Amino acid sequence: MTYQNGVEVLLEEFLDYLTKEETICSLEIEKLKVSIDELEKETDEPRVLQGINYFRTAKEVYQLSRKAYETKEEVVSEALILWIYENLWKGFNVPKGYRKSDMVIFGAKFSPPPPYVVPNLIRTIVNWLRNEKTIDVVKKSIIFHTLFEVIHPFPDGNGRVGRILLNAILVENGLLNVAFRNREKYISALREAEEGAIVVVEKLSRGRKIDYSSITETVEYYGNLNVFDELIRTEMMHSLKVYSNIKQVFLTPEEAAKLLGLKNKDYVRVLIHRGKLKAVKEEGKWKIPLSEVVKNFEHKLKGEEFKLANNLFKGKLSPS
């Protein structure tokens, strides 16, 4: 068994595998099937080329996001969004840039805003992303994703662009990109979460000024983000479980807290001291095996909630 430290190991060594899996799952959401082997081909067959374009585009974006994680920079920008769209449709006769006409989405609860407001809306949500510092990264990625999908800025491929951006936000903040393996669960989670985004986009489209904190509060108030949050963490833990069977990686309390969705590292220390999370201490610092983090998350999904962490959050316990 090989032992290594830190989430950055996962980002570096597991990225190719995860991005291939993500590509297959992301296209299956749109009922387009490609195989892992086909992603390595050179072809102009439209079905396969869409998969190749997604894989190559996503991988390059996540490599940029990984570097941004190391340098504490921000990778998501309007220029990146336009670049992703253009590269997803490389080799196809698809218009560049934002859509130039109104759009109707079959089965949606909303109508995307008129094309003339799209550029300003995209700049607004990018600025929101850069200025929002009060919520955890998974919730942040969900809010951005729902806002982007409601804006629906492009003639086609909005779901693909949006999922790459969601994952770029996760990777930029030290987490892994996720593959949504169940189409129905993804669509259901998106529908539950998007209610607040619909309210925000409608207000912004009418010229209303909304500050960044109000955007967050509105999306959280009207939309149910919890289902989407749990789906992302479940998919991430699925991937981590596969990886932990190959290689043993130790995480810091901060990294473990981020993966588990806990408020801060003190919650992790409480779980360690109470024997709920196995860890080792070296040179005065706790190191938690990735496999233990996965195990605890699985217990949580089965209904064995993190009662100690919740009690700490309510002020009933103090960290050791």
From Swiss-Prot:
It is an enzyme of class 2 (transferase). Its EC number is 2.7.7.108. PROSITE patterns: FIDO. Residues 76-206 form the Fido domain. It catalyses: L-tyrosyl-[protein] + ATP = O-(5'-adenylyl)-L-tyrosyl-[protein] + diphosphate; L-threonyl-[protein] + ATP = 3-O-(5'-adenylyl)-L-threonyl-[protein] + diphosphate. Pfam families: Fic, HTH_17. Keywords: ATP-binding, Nucleotide-binding, Nucleotidyltransferase, Plasmid, Transferase. GO terms for molecular function: AMPylase activity; ATP binding; DNA binding. InterPro entries: Fido, Fido-like_dom_sf, Fido_containing, HTH_17, SinI_DNA-bd. ATP binds at K100, S101, G157, N158, G159, R163. Belongs to the fic family. Probable adenylyltransferase that mediates the addition of adenosine 5'-monophosphate (AMP) to specific residues of target proteins. This is Probable protein adenylyltransferase aq_aa38.
